[in-house]
Amino acid sequence: VIAWVDGSDPELSKKRMKYLDSNEKDLIPGANPTRFHSLNEISYCVLSILKFAPFVRKIFIVTDKQNPNIDNVVKQYFPERVSDIQIVDHLEIFEGYEDYLPTFNSICISNMLWRIKDLSNQFVYFNDDVFLVKHIKPSVWFQNNRPVLRGKWMLPPYERLIWDGLKSFFQSTILGKQIERVSSFQVNQWNAALLHGFKFRYFLSGHTPLALDKKRLKDYFTLHPEKLKENLKHRFRKYTQF
């Protein structure tokens, strides 16, 4: 599963600005245009999967009424796999949660990937700027029917939390600007650890393909619908999310 967006699309930009006050757009880090840039990385991402992980059954590209138009390049190198590439609109995975659309928040989108129709129980989540560079086996991602976690146990990100707190204090007290704290993948993962009772350490995953279990995600969010809704309500990425 690959999450993708083309930030240069004028329709998407217009939609995004609708949810931003003209005075807010520079104060919300999650609305920074650089978060939505596309340099055609999606083509290389897809081709790398087809070449180096041919055992992958399907590739789902999740997007908001957009199309990366990669059929021709896939047809050129892997003509037999064109039908295995499927575009999934946000409306499909947010069915029943349409009030939270549109969203411009990759965390919210990732929370809903398990709702893709025809998705295998074992699936791998890619960002469009992540590529495979050599042949791999399924065991790289799953062993004994369980996801392989890639990362390391870390102490809580105290340094980042303290620095962010000081910066926020300086901006609001000295500069008089209420600028939101910049969302951090360390802090967002720490927030997830806190939800599960971890107080003194957390497991930090890097910017890498993530092996996931659809049933576990479904079970968790079914048992904790309010936590899901709390995460989904932020149209732009936020510091407090998990």
Predicted regions, residues:
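Short, acidic, metal-binding catalytic loop of nucleotide-sugar glycosyltransferases
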Residues: 48-56
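Short beta-strand/loop segment that forms part of the nucleotide-sugar
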Residues: 57-66
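Long, charge-rich alpha-helical interaction segments
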Residues: 148-242
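Short, hydrophobic/glycine-enriched beta-strand segments
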Residues: 1-7
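Active-site-proximal specificity loops/subdomain of glycosyltransferases
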Residues: 26-33, 37, 69-119
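Short catalytic/ligand-binding loop motif for oxyanion handling, primarily in non-cytosolic enzymes
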Residues: 8-12, 67-72, 95-96, 131-135, ...
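A solvent-exposed, charged loop/short amphipathic helix patch at secondary-structure junctions
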Residues: 7-35
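GT-A fold catalytic core of metal-dependent nucleotide-sugar glycosyltransferases
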Residues: 67-68, 112-155
